[in-house]
Curated annotation (Swiss-Prot):
Alphabetical list of InterPro entries matching this protein: Ribosomal_eL34 (IPR008195), Ribosomal_eL34_C_sf (IPR038562), Ribosomal_L34e_arc-type (IPR047868)
Gene designation per UniProt: rpl34e
PANTHER family: 60S RIBOSOMAL PROTEIN L34 (PTHR10759)
Protein name: Large ribosomal subunit protein eL34
Coiled-coil segments on the chain, per record: none
A GO term from the CC aspect: ribonucleoprotein complex
Entry's Gene Ontology BP terms: translation
Location of the region described as Disordered in the Swiss-Prot/TrEMBL record: 1-22
Family: Belongs to the eukaryotic ribosomal protein eL34 family.
A family per Pfam: Ribosomal_L34e
């Protein structure tokens, strides 16, 4: 039986070969999924992938791009939105 801390869904099983041709199980923390655009669902560049504990240690400029809606929308969607707002203004 695995220890209770390894039964969580946030742990990932990794099988390793040990000397003597026996296999053992290592447990690793799963990575967070990649950030996606809120409008079109495209993957966002410049946004780190990791657990919240790891991301809080990064500087503010390393967490997301320094532009309007950086980290939430992709550049194409931001451009479309700004053009649409300028035309309706």
């Amino acid at each position: 039986m695995p220890a209770p801390r390894y039964k969580s869904g946030s742990s990932k099983k990794v099988y390793r070969k040990a000397p003597g041709n026996s296999s053992i199980v290592h447990y690793r923390r799963k990575k967070q999924s990649k950030a996606v655009c809120g409008a079109c669902g495209a993957l966002l560049n410049g946004v780190p992938r990791g657990r919240a504990v790891e991301i809080t240690k990064l500087a503010k400029t390393e967490k997301r791009p320094e532009r309007p809606f950086g980290g939430n929308l992709c550049p194409k969607c931001v451009k479309k939105m700004m053009v649409a707002k300028a035309r309706n203004f």
